[in-house]
């Protein structure tokens, strides 16, 4: 299991990996979210609520999550009840894949 959480240093590192998005104001520090004001977060996130609880949807979710993370989205929304916990597992699989390939670090992503 991958451990860790988003940090100010990590999210700034992620933001700086996308200079065109950074310069366009895509990354922001949320002013009204307790505990998140030091994080650099993408202006859009990826939600994981809908979809069938099956292997085909799991594969599509994992690929979509990895694509989003490679494209400048570092905010992922999930909960234990989304797709019977499968969405959380798909996020974990995508994160593990990208961390293992050294494409990103866990501290760059807000889940």
Please provide the spans of the model-predicted regions:
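N-terminal binding-site loop/beta-alpha segment at the start of enzyme catalytic domains
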Residues: 1-110
């Amino acid at each position: 299991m991958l451990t860790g959480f988003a940090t100010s240093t990590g999210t700034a590192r992620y933001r700086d990996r996308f200079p065109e998005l950074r310069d366009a104001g895509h990354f922001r520090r949320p002013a009204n979210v307790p505990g998140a004001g030091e994080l650099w977060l993408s202006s859009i996130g990826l939600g994981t609520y809908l979809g069938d609880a099956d292997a085909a949807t799991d594969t599509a979710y994992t690929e979509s999550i990895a694509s989003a993370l490679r494209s400048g989205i570092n905010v992922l929304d999930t909960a234990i009840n989304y797709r019977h916990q499968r969405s959380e597992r798909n996020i974990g699989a995508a994160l593990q894949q990208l961390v293992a390939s050294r494409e990103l670090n866990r501290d760059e992503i807000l889940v």
